[in-house]
C-alpha cells in the first residue's frame, strides 16, 4: 500500500497495485479499459524483476504496451520519492525501458560478456527473443536497437534471428495444426496412416 499512497501523494494518481498477488490477465483486461500503455514499477530486487518479467507477456497478450521503470539504487517507489522527490520519479517514467528491451537487459546480466562462449550463448538467446516478434517492422526496430546496445554487427544478429524465426514459425504452424478442428480430410489421412502402420 505504501508505494501507491506515496505515488498518489506525489501527484501520480493513475497508479494501481496488484496488492501482493501476481499480475493477472483479468487485471490486464481491466487496465485496457483505461489505457494502452502500462509502466511497471515493481521493486528493484530479484522478486520485483521476476514479477516484471511475468507481467510483460500478459500485457502484450491483452494489447497493452509495457515499459519498466528503473528504481535503482532504491528498493521501491516510496523510497525513491522520499529520497529524490516527484520530479526524479517523473524523469524515470520518461526514460522507462520498453518491455522487450528490459527482457534483453535482464538476459545480458545473466551471462559473462567477457567470456566468448557465454557471450555467444547470450546472443543466441537474444536472437530467439527477437524471432518471436511477429510484426516485421517492430522486429527490425528491436533488431537494430539490440545490435547497437550489445555491440554486434546487425547483419550477424539478423542472420541468427532469421534462423530461429523459421523454427518459431514452424512450431506455430504445427501447434495450430494440432489444435485445429479435425476435418474430414484429416480424419481420412489419420485412418490411412493407421492402416499403413506395421502390425
Kindly give the residue locations of the regions a language model identified.
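Short, polar loop motifs at secondary-structure junctions
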Residues: 1-3
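A charged alpha-helical hairpin associated with nucleic-acid processing machineries
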Residues: 22-38, 42-199
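Short hydrophobic/aromatic-enriched beta-strand-loop microsegments
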Residues: 13-20, 158
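Alpha-helix C-terminal capping segments
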Residues: 5-13, 34
Amino acid at each position: 500500500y505504501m508505494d501507491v499512497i506515496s505515488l498518489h501523494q506525489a501527484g501520480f494518481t493513475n497508479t494501481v497495485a496488484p496488492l501482493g498477488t501476481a499480475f493477472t490477465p483479468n487485471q490486464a483486461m481491466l487496465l485496457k479499459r483505461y489505457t494502452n500503455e502500462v509502466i511497471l514499477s515493481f521493486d528493484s530486487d530479484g522478486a520485483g524483476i521476476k514479477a516484471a518479467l511475468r507481467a510483460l507477456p500478459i500485457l502484450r497478450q491483452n494489447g497493452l504496451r509495457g515499459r519498466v521503470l528503473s528504481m535503482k539504487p532504491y528498493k521501491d517507489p516510496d523510497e525513491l520519492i522520499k529520497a529524490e522527490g516527484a520530479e526524479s520519479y517523473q524523469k524515470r517514467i520518461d526514460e522507462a525501458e520498453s518491455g522487450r528491451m528490459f527482457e534483453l537487459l535482464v538476459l545480458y546480466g545473466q551471462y559473462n560478456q567477457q567470456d566468448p562462449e557465454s557471450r555467444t550463448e547470450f546472443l543466441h538467446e537474444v536472437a530467439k527473443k527477437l524471432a518471436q516478434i511477429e510484426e516485421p517492422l517492430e522486429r527490425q526496430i528491436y533488431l537494430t536497437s539490440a545490435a547497437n546496445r550489445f555491440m554486434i554487427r546487425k547483419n550477424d544478429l539478423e542472420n541468427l534471428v532469421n534462423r530461429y524465426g523459421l523454427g518459431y514459425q514452424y512450431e506455430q504452424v504445427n501447434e495450430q495444426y494440432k489444435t485445429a478442428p479435425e476435418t474430414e480430410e484429416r480424419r481420412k489421412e489419420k485412418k490411412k496412416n493407421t492402416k499403413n502402420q506395421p502390425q
